[in-house]
Amino acid sequence: MLTWNVTYHCKPGQRADFYQALCSLGIRENSIHEEGNLKYDYFFAAEAPDDLLLVETWTEQALQDAHCSTEIFAQLQALKARYCDSVHIDKFNY
């Protein structure tokens, strides 16, 4: 099993718009129905107003890799380019 903590460092003042765009595209709804996905949840950082945290858990790496090749993932990349300054990923395998 693997969990990724993905911190999106949004452009100043863009976190709410980024999150709304993610919701409008159905990123989470699509992802939670993919094979091997156990968790795909967003969290707002209380002390970092421009950060959005995604915690995603997968049963195996191959299925997470498949997620990264979906059309919805490609659309996510376009949103990141528009709304985010950078992204940091912490990966945990267990």
Q: Would you name each region that the model predicts?
A:
Residues 61-71, 86, 90-92:
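Catalytic cores of transferase enzymes with a strong primary signal for eukaryotic protein kinases
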Residues 2-9, 39-68:
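Short, well-ordered beta-strand segments in beta-rich or mixed alpha/beta enzyme
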Residues 38-50, 75-94:
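Glycine-rich beta-strand-turn "strand-cap" elements at beta-sheet edges
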Residues 14-38, 72-75:
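Short amphipathic alpha-helical segments
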Residues 22, 67-68, 77-80:
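Short, flexible helix/strand-to-coil boundary loops that buttress conserved ligand/catalytic motifs
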